[in-house]
């Protein structure tokens, strides 16, 4: 008969996968306060004997964190309390179930890597401890120990099969998480593409907004120039109207002077007529005086004729001046209306310029926001990639653990078969 495989009972044997490094991760399922852990274990094991509870507390507070170095303390406690190995294993399993399902004393659901690490560490510990207990019992009790060892091996086989089922479920959940991660990554990629399109559109609209702002500024400057020109025209028209009014006043003064000249000509003509009469009375001595009187009369008549011509021209000038004055008044009114319209247009251009500036500022903010969203989506994609890598690592670890557990199950079954044949 071939002897039992020492790798099942010797804690110094190298496991198929490294487990010691997983213990800190396994501890993440447990609360940091020992009293909380103690209360949790007592609550889960309310129907178990006190010495079993004490052994479980010893395992979770000392053995699980410290590994093989603390096996002796737990084995001593098991021996001192005469604790049944099967009852102890069942109690540890009872505590493990709510921890792995997320009903443990810590807040929130457990991380996948913590669940995997905890399951692997406990599986190794239970296998090694059961082997040590079985070996000690065999040395102490002989054939009775062999029977107990067979029962222990059967229990280990059952636990290993349950562990296989758990590993299959964990592997299924890991695969599902990987699929969900891939789907989420695809969704994030679509969102990133949409954000990039929005950013591109915002950039294009922002460029056009800058062009509109430039045009609005140019239009505003042109409107300012038009207003200044209209103001200059209005001032010029007002000045010409004032000058025309002054000219009209001067022509009226000329008209008064012409009337005076006409009066003088009439009086001179009357004096010349009187002089002619007096010269006729004076006979031959008044001939020279008569000639002078005729000359004076001729000059008076010519002066009157010139004065009448001047008066006619002055009247024409006055008519034209009045017409020009009326036209200038109308032109001044029109320039005032144009000035008012130009000022209103200037205000409108200023409002357009302010609105376009506001739109440009808003578009700059949208552009900055989309850039931040793009950065966030890139960071999220990196986080999802990291989560996917961890999920793949967990899946690989679970597969490795399942292989190791399956190999151990085969060894246990072979050991059980050999033990049955040796009886």
UniProtKB/Swiss-Prot annotation:
Keyword Transport set for record: no
PTM remark: Methylated by CheR.
InterPro entries xref list: Chemotax_Me-accpt_rcpt, MCPsignal_dom
Region (Disordered): 1-21
One Pfam family linked to the record: MCPsignal
Biased composition (Polar residues): 1-19
Entry GO terms, CC: cytoplasm; membrane
One term of GO molecular function: transmembrane signaling receptor activity
Function: Potentially involved in chemo- or phototactic signal transduction.
Protein name stated in the entry: Transducer protein Htr13
UniProt gene name: htr13
